[in-house]
Regions:
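Glycine-rich, flexible loop motifs
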Residues: 2-13, 19-50, 77-135, 227, ...
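C-terminal auxiliary extensions adjacent to catalytic cores
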Residues: 2-23, 27-34, 38-41, 46, ...
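Polyanion/phosphate-binding surface patch
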Residues: 49-51, 66, 253-254
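FAD-binding core of FAD-dependent oxidoreductases
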Residues: 54-68, 72-76, 83-108, 136-158, ...
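Catalytic or ion-translocation cores adjacent to nucleophile or general acid/base/metal-coordination motifs
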Residues: 72-85, 356-366
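Conserved, non-catalytic sequence blocks in retroelement Pol enzymes and Pol-derived host proteins
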Residues: 112, 141-143, 373
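Membrane-embedded alpha-helical core segments of multi-pass
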Residues: 127-131, 149, 158, 220
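Cysteine-centered functional microenvironments
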Residues: 135-140, 317-321
Length: 495
């Protein structure tokens, strides 16, 4: 399928559909008109005006007072891209690079950046041909936009930088020869338009949002299985309890837990224990808070991915070219830090439920194995979950609380939003692993409640899970089962 790039509202769900469905991109007629109109306006203003225009007829950052002659305007832009490609460390995953390309095209298509049409179309060529520019995780301070990663993202269109194509790493020049493309010749302002923007931060945020929404759904299902295995009570999910403290996420989670447990034989059994530990009893309050955080962060990211984040902003209809600060990552850096905390909390409470399941209480055998002693059973998966949860806690220090001046103090306050995005994605991956370990334990523990059955919904999940992860009778290497559990969460359909 082909997705038309237009002014129509782009949602996170639509991005997921485009990426997962391997859709191609095409500019709408209206987008072509906006891009062309803005470029024509910019060229006209450069020709007519003797006033300096930041980044167009001047240097960059603290070099903004240096005027550039007309015969050097194109070289200025290519020099900018080359000099700003300073990324280090691990590569940004290809899935996120693909989202970066989509968001860069979307932002440029609004017609506020002054790029040429062929420049945008070459970015689309990269996307449509599954060409992944080699972009590095470290280097962006999140203002002036994502300069370093976007330099790496866009260098290949001018025949520089590096890409991965069909599993092979090659230079941008080699790619152009292989594809039969002429390297794009940048006009005035184009390098700045390509490098200024929040698409690296935003792409990490979008990826994390897609992952977080899925994990939030899984967390409820896995918690319900753990509750059944732990012989927990359903009363804490009663609607009347939550109606007197009606946070939206809390209400939704309690309702979801009631749905998941509906029809269970286990939940209807007389309970010896008057109440459950917090990690079970407070599922609506904790999981619900995560849902509310995801909802809030999603609303902010939704605005960001439908915005022009260039500088200067070119407004042809208002006859304005204004140097301002739409590149600053603070609006999304803070929410990404918030979501990082929420996802870490989801893993914290999950690990606590795992701990309870292996603790040898409520008629469950120690470490969920029939013959503990000679067998260590599920002792150590909880250690792994604890180690991962602990790492996530250390990653919750907000990146947006930090700033370091750059460019001789001209860019004296930055967002560090790129760091926020990178660690958010890491915490999401960590949370997925912790939840997978809880499922591994919960499914094992549930077998000690047989022949009683859980609800039809949960029994269906367990049946599918047992196709890839067996019941463990005796000690064996556990890491393959944990890996299969992670894959199950990634691949199994979840509503």
């Amino acid at each position: 399928m082909t997705h038309q790039i237009s002014a129509e509202h782009l949602t996170i769900a639509k991005i997921a559909e485009i990426i997962e469905g391997h859709h191609t991109l095409k500019l709408s007629a209206d987008a072509v008109k906006r891009i062309t109109h803005c470029r024509e306006y910019l060229d006209k203003k450069i020709a007519e005006s003797d006033k300096p225009i930041y980044g167009v007829t001047t240097g960059f950052g603290s070099l903004c007072k240096i005027s550039i002659s007309n015969d050097q305007l194109s070289q200025l832009q290519i020099n900018l891209m080359m000099s700003h490609a300073c990324g280090v460390g691990e590569r940004v995953p290809n899935d996120i690079v693909k989202i970066m390309l989509l968001l860069k095209v979307q932002s440029l298509s609004y017609g506020y950046s002054g790029v040429k049409l062929d420049t945008v179309e070459r970015l689309i060529d990269l996307f449509n041909n599954d060409v992944y520019p080699v972009v590095y995780k470290q280097g962006s301070v999140g203002a002036s936009g994502d300069l370093v990663p976007l330099a790496h993202l866009c260098l290949p269109i001018v025949g520089l930088g590096e890409v991965e194509y069909k599993g092979e790493r090659m230079s941008g020049g080699e790619l152009c020869k292989k594809m039969g493309w002429e390297p794009v010749k940048l006009g005035s302002k184009e390098g700045l338009a390509l490098l200024n923007g929040t698409q690296n931060m935003s792409a990490h945020a979008v990826w994390a949002m897609i992952k977080a929404e899925r994990l939030s759904k899984w967390a409820d299902v896995i918690a319900a299985i753990s509750l059944e295995a732990y012989d927990g009570r359903v009363e804490p999910f009663t609607h009347a309890v939550h109606a007197v403290r009606p946070h939206q996420g809390q209400i939704e989670t309690a309702a979801r837990m009631r749905e998941l447990l509906d029809g269970s034989e286990l939940i209807r059994q007389p309970k010896v224990n008057v109440q459950d530990p917090y990690s079970f009893r407070c599922i609506p309050q904790v999981h619900g808070s995560v849902k509310d955080t995801i909802r809030y962060v999603g609303s902010v990211i939704d605005t960001e991915i439908n915005s022009a984040t260039d500088n200067p902003t070119v407004c042809p209809d208002e006859d304005l070219i204004i140097s301002a600060g739409n590149f600053h990552g603070e609006p999304i850096a803070m929410p990404m830090d918030f979501l990082c905390i929420a996802m870490a909390e989801l893993s914290n409470i999950s690990e606590r439920r795992t701990y309870k399941l292996v603790s040898g209480t409520r008629d469950l055998p120690s470490f969920l194995v029939a013959h503990p002693g000679v067998n260590s059973g599920f002792m150590i998966p909880q250690y792994t979950a604890a180690a991962i949860a602990s790492q996530s806690k250390t990653l919750c220090m907000p990146s947006s609380a930090d700033t370091i001046p750059t460019s001789q103090g001209q860019e004296d306050h930055v967002s560090m939003g790129a760091n926020a995005g990178v660690k958010l994605c890491k915490v999401c991956e960590n949370t997925e692993r912790v939840l997978a370990i809880e499922l591994f334990n919960a499914a094992q523990a549930l077998e000690f409640r047989r022949p009683l059955k859980s609800s039809p919904v949960l029994e269906h999940v367990i049946a599918d899970y047992r196709k890839v992860v067996p019941f463990i009778n005796e000690d064996q290497p556990m890491y393959p089962h944990i890996a299969k559990s992670v894959e199950f969460l990634q691949n199994e359909k979840i509503d």
